[in-house]
Swiss-Prot record:
Membrane topology of this protein: Single-pass membrane protein
Name this protein carries in UniProt: Biosynthetic peptidoglycan transglycosylase
Transmembrane segment boundaries: 19-41
Example of a GO cellular component annotation carried by this entry: peptidoglycan-based cell wall
Taxon lineage: Bacteria, Pseudomonadati, Pseudomonadota, Gammaproteobacteria, Lysobacterales
Length: 245
């Protein structure tokens, strides 16, 4: 009996050391796995994103078992040139210049929110891609930290055009309508390559709340925002403002 107790005491330190090694190795393993994940999606088009999975789970949780979403991938050069510049004009005008985070926009949003106005975000297109492709919905500090991590990796390993291509294919433009191709087909019965400048601006205009606003039958807010986006796109210089392939 005494020998058994002694053996247990001797076995405890190695077990603790193994646990400690795993605890120390876990962040490195996660970092390596996430880098491989981002590198993989640099060249492979994802059939579904984490946000789409979340939308399915949300619908099923509400008892809507018949819910289906619409999404079809389109390469960047198969999308009307008016859509990328419209999205950049609406969502992230510093996109070609920043490295994932628009510090000036963050500061403006912080000042605006501190004054007690309607809460304003400052997420760049790169941050939105990180959130939509890799993460879940939520506002926890853990998710925010992971969003920042994936944003850094995306900016490090993907060219700007790939980031924008990914965004145009996973962004939600209507309830269950993801990506430019599905939006063009569902709303106007055409291919994404045939979107007009006005249609492109309308799609960009609904991005703040795509389940609330309608690009096909725009209300007053979407109409005003559409005109503003078109003016901004012209002032930026049109499609030539964006990085070349």
């Amino acid at each position: 009996m005494g020998t058994d107790v002694w053996d247990d005491k001797q076995a405890a330190p190695p077990r603790r050391r193994r646990c400690l090694r795993w605890v120390l190795a876990a962040p490195l393993l996660f970092a390596a796995a996430s880098v491989l994940q981002v590198l993989f999606l640099r060249v492979v088009d994802p059939p579904i994103s984490s946000m789409m999975v979340g939308r399915y789970l949300e619908a099923w949780g509400e008892g809507d078992w018949s819910f289906s979403l619409h999404q079809r991938w389109r390469d960047y050069d198969k999308i009307a040139a008016s859509l990328p510049i419209s999205v950049v004009a609406a969502e992230d005008q510093q996109f070609p210049m920043h490295h994932g985070f628009d510090l000036q926009a963050i500061e403006k949003a912080r000042d605006h929110n501190a004054r007690g106005g309607r809460v304003r975000g400052a997420s760049t297109i790169s941050q939105q891609v990180a959130k939509n492709v890799f993460l879940w919905q939520g506002r926890s500090w853990v998710r925010k930290g992971l969003e920042a991590w994936y944003t850094v990796l995306i900016e490090l390993f993907w060219p700007k055009q790939r980031i924008l291509e990914m965004y145009l294919n996973v962004a939600e433009f209507g309830d269950g309508v993801y990506g430019a191709q599905a939006a063009a087909q569902q709303f106007w019965g055409k291919d994404a390559a045939g979107l007009s400048p006005t249609e492109s601006a309308r799609l960009a205009a609904v991005l703040p709340s795509p389940r609330h606003y309608d690009a096909r039958s725009p209300g007053a807010f979407v109409q005003r925002r559409t005109m503003w986006i078109q003016r901004q796109a012209r002032q930026l210089g049109g499609p030539a403002y964006l990085p070349a392939p």
